A protein has these predicted regions:
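Acidic-glycine-rich active-site phosphate/pyrophosphate-binding loop
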Residues: 12-32, 77-78
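Short, small-residue-biased leader/transition segments that mark boundaries at the very start
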Residues: 1-2
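Short loop segments at secondary-structure junctions
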Residues: 7-10
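Helical "substrate-binding/catalytic lid" subdomain
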Residues: 37-139
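Electropositive, surface-exposed helix/loop patches at the edges of structured domains
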Residues: 22-31, 102-116, 151-157
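Short, basic/aromatic-enriched C-terminal tail that caps enzymatic domains
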Residues: 137-158
């Protein structure tokens, strides 16, 4: 998906690019409107993957992974499906998402909110970036590999 902001006659020009097969979404508004949509969209999609990273890894470490999976399958099956399909795709992208999460924090700060939440999400993606590469089948395998990466991380005492 490619977000571009345009208004007036420029919106019509961008809209015509759809005829060439490009997935263009015109966002009405001034400069920065499309970037704001992109940041808010990524906050939800990539933020959910960061939450799922910590939730599944923590559940695994605490011995309640199967109970979490059962609860999600019953009450929020779409979340379980998103985690099982999405988390295995995250590690090769994590290094790129760190700066994006920091940018989301700055965007939210400009809207009057604390940037702390997405600075912490950037830290989650730093941890994910330390995972060993290789295929993963679901959220449970992802969690185990993330926990292994956390175990290998050097500490301040090293």
């Amino acid at each position: 998906m490619l977000f571009r902001s345009a208004s007036g006659p420029h919106a019509a020009t961008f809209a015509r690019l759809r005829e060439q097969g490009l997935d263009i979404r015109v966002v009405e508004g001034g400069i920065g409107a499309a970037s704001a949509v992109k940041m808010c969209y990524a906050a939800l999609t990539k933020g959910l993957m960061a939450l799922a990273s910590q939730a599944f890894a923590s559940a695994s470490r605490l011995g309640v992974a199967e109970a979490l999976r059962t609860e999600l399958a019953t009450s929020r099956p779409w979340v379980l499906d998103e985690a099982d399909k999405g988390l295995p795709k995250v590690p090769p992208k994590a290094y790129r998402w760190i700066a994006e999460m920091e940018e989301i924090g700055a965007t939210f700060a400009a809207a009057g909110f604390t940037p702390d939440l997405f600075e912490a999400v950037a830290d989650v993606y730093r941890q994910v970036g330390a995972m060993e590469p290789g295929p993963l089948k679901d959220a449970d395998q992802y969690a185990e590999r993330l926990l292994a990466a956390l175990t290998r991380r050097p500490t301040a005492a090293d």
